[in-house]
């Protein structure tokens, strides 16, 4: 039976909405990409950060799973360096002298009847399309790698082991790893830390994609606030939010949507979304879309009946105050997101605020109910690659304090997206989305 009356102002049934979400996701799957020059600049920067040697990276060979509704998604770092969204490719970079080669599988006529035409290494425009100096067949990687490796000592950077689905053509690297060809000759190093340091600083194109994801997802949150009422299911609100960001160009959710009401507002990674919202409860909505591979991460908390109780408002305002305290404490090049007693930790600022404002039913401070970190970097992954460096220009991250009291069935989290611009200013990318308790209540009025 369709839930025709579920969304106020909408006449779709739930089944229709889910269908529309999937159709919109498929329609949006033609991922936008940056200019080839942007990806090349990243490869050159990575080569400069390497201590000599060569880098070898492989794309996964298959989709995420046999029943994956959203299709293949490229591995984050491979996409960051290549802009290539299809499976079964590889990249080889030598640091000095700089050499870059992209490897593609040969055309497979039978397979392409199922998957559609693919760019092959023999295509005359392969170099132009990919933006690489040279494009070769995957079968030639073995020979190309041997041409590059120096003697008597070779360093090979890779991220083998981070990909569950490894291409058959990883053979050359595995061959070197075993030392069958050059015993005591090849030293392997992990490329992930080097790539992470690059990925944590976003360029203008990346920031724009994140803004697109954020704006589309904000529309989903606004629609949800208008639609929430006693008796509606968490799943309906989740579907509505995905519909709204899907119709604005997001190809998929950036993570499993979380819509938890009542007791489930206190469960951090609750993803069943299968309960009916009850009068007097709050609902936590942690939902964001992915635009052209780039994520956003937004959370809002709302009263199911449109009006916070006095106790809910008290907890909400403490969480809001903690976020405001962290924002005001931000210092360029000094503040950190990580937990710890360090006075430069924004987490400590938020925690101290929560722990000195309000009590639980047993008159204990509320700090113990703030059970997660304050924030994380966002980019190609919703919990993006980074290192513990202080916050600086070009970084995109969340600030998301929360209080979760199971005994009272009250969970409150407020999560916003932030970017540090080239002037060193902290910019809230979710500016305009209802954030105070009063703004949330006003947005829910019909």
Regions found by a protein language model. Name each.
Residues 13-25:
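Bacterial N-terminal signal peptides
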Residues 1-3, 9, 26-446:
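Active-site neighborhoods and metal-handling regions in enzymes and metal-associated proteins
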């Amino acid at each position: 039976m369709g839930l025709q009356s579920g969304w106020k102002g909408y006449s779709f049934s739930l089944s229709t909405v889910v269908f529309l979400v999937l159709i919109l996701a498929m329609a949006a799957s033609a991922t936008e990409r940056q200019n080839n020059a942007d990806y090349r600049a990243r490869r050159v920067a990575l080569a400069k950060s390497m201590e000599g040697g060569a880098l070898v990276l492989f794309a996964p060979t298959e989709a995420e799973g046999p029943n994956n509704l959203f299709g293949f998604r490229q591995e984050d770092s491979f996409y960051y360096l290549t802009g290539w969204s299809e499976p079964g490719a590889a990249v080889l970079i030598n640091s000095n002298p700089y050499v870059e080669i992209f490897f593609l599988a040969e055309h497979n006529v039978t397979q392409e009847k199922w998957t559609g035409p693919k760019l092959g290494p023999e295509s005359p425009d392969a170099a132009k399309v990919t933006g690489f100096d040279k494009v070769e067949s995957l079968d030639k990687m073995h020979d190309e790698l041997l041409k590059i490796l120096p003697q008597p000592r070779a360093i090979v950077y890779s991220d083998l082991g981070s990909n569950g689905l490894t291409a058959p053509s990883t053979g050359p690297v595995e061959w070197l790893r075993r030392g069958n060809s050059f015993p005591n000759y090849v030293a392997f190093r992990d490329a992930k830390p080097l790539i992470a340091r690059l990925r944590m600083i976003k360029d203008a194109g990346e920031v724009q994609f994140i803004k697109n994801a954020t704006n589309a997802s904000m529309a989903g949150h606004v629609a949800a606030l208008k639609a929430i009422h006693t008796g509606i299911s968490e799943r309906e609100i989740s579907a509505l939010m995905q519909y709204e960001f899907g119709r604005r160009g997001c190809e998929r959710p950036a993570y499993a949507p979380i819509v938890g009401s009542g007791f489930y507002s206190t469960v951090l990674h609750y993803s069943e979304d299968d309960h009916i919202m009850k009068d007097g409860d709050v609902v936590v909505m942690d939902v964001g879309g992915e635009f052209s591979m780039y994520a956003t991460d937004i959370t809002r908390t709302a009263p199911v009946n449109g009006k916070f109780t006095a106790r809910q408002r008290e907890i909400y305002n403490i969480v809001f105050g903690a976020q405001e305290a962290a924002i005001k404490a931000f210092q360029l090049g000094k503040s950190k997101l990580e937990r710890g007693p360090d006075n430069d930790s924004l987490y400590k600022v938020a925690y101290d605020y929560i722990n000195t404002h309000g009590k639980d039913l047993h008159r204990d401070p509320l700090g113990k109910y703030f059970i997660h970190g304050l924030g994380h970097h966002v980019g190609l992954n919703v919990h993006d690659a980074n290192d513990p460096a202080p916050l600086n220009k070009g970084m995109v991250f969340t600030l998301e304090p929360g209080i979760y009291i199971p005994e009272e069935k009250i969970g409150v989290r407020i999560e916003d997206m932030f970017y540090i611009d080239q002037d060193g200013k902290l910019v809230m990318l979710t500016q305009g989305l209802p954030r105070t308790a009063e703004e949330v209540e006003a947005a829910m009025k019909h």
